[in-house]
Amino acid sequence: MSVMFDPDTAIYPFPPKPTPLSIDEKAYYREKIKRLLKERNAVMVAHYYTDPEIQQLAEETGGCISDSLEMARFGAKHPASTLLVAGVRFMGETAKILSPEKTILMPTLQVECSLDLGCPVEEFNAFYDAHPDRTVVVYANTSAAVKARADWVVTSSIAVELIDHLDSLGEKIIWAPDKHLGRYVQKQTGGDILCWQGACIVHDEFKTQALTRLQEEYPDAAILVHPESPQAIVDMADAVGSTSQLIAAAKALPHQRLIVATDRGIFYKMQQAVPDKELLEAPTAGEGATCRSCAHCPWMAMNDLQAIAEALEQEGSNHEVHVDERLRERALVPLNRMLDFAATLRG
């Protein structure tokens, strides 16, 4: 595997944490959101990494809690005229690309993703142009502009299957932006992959030594790992997979104690799936090290109840997602390829 462009994730400024709400304030905003969703003919689409109270509200209002692939499917098929996307910006853009006729709202448009930030379109275009013989596969965690230059978009839930398919056709791959997921896929498939060097600030922080000590403390625990984690962490796993695949693994494994190496937002749905099992966070700091994300995406944390209520009430430029139509049409092609390929896997 060849590598290039190594963005420094340490330079990304973290957003300020939302001001904590009182119990009464939370109750007020919950009821307000429920009312506004009905008035606006809107539905919530929330990612597994949002805070538990956001996921709970999506459940209670007939919305969706899922990984980015299922979020895309759900939003495109749901009859609501407005989608409230609780996640990060590329998820809102993806919803708009797939459903241009719908109003796409987000609690704030400043919800970034370190993978997206680490793959600026100008640098990506230069890399793309330097390797015209390669099929371009980009992770869903990219901007609409980067998706528009791709042949395929992929999520972690189908990454191995797609690259295995393309490799069987003799295609050489450009992979962007996550280096850890790219290396995992390359190891699983043996594909010829030229890999961008981005990383998720959450998964990149998991520490091998600290995880080993936790494993020694709980030798009966299984380790579940998202493939955006470093290879040394992946090598310790009893199960590796996307968010939805990790929840399925938690149910399938016989272990009563699980160490989970992904954003702790997943614990809400995972604990529902395995109410009798104990879930432990994989450590993100160790031996003189400190964590920046501490196993929770700081941009996902910006999706709070007050911001959601304001998005539904105010609309406008601070909350509504727009994608240039020409860009949208180009990005739609690889997104539809992803959805069609995923449909063949589901049978």
From Swiss-Prot:
Assigned keywords, A-Z: 4Fe-4S, Cytoplasm, Iron, Iron-sulfur, Metal-binding, Pyridine nucleotide biosynthesis, Transferase
Cellular component, GO annotation: cytosol
Catalytic activity: iminosuccinate + dihydroxyacetone phosphate = quinolinate + phosphate + 2 H2O + H(+)
Binding site for iminosuccinate: H47, S68, Y139, A140, N141, S156, H226, P227, E228, T243
Pfam families noted in UniProt: NadA
Pathway connected to this protein: Cofactor biosynthesis; NAD(+) biosynthesis; quinolinate from iminoaspartate: step 1/1
Manner of cofactor binding, per the entry note: Binds 1 [4Fe-4S] cluster per subunit.
Positions bound to [4Fe-4S] cluster: C113, C200, C297
Cofactor: [4Fe-4S] cluster
GO BP terms, alphabetized: 'de novo' NAD biosynthetic process from L-aspartate
Domain of life where this protein originates: Bacteria
The protein's Enzyme Commission number: 2.5.1.72
PANTHER family associated with the record: QUINOLINATE SYNTHASE, CHLOROPLASTIC, QUINOLINATE SYNTHETASE A
Protein name from the UniProt record: Quinolinate synthase
Source organism per UniProt: Shigella flexneri
Gene field: nadA
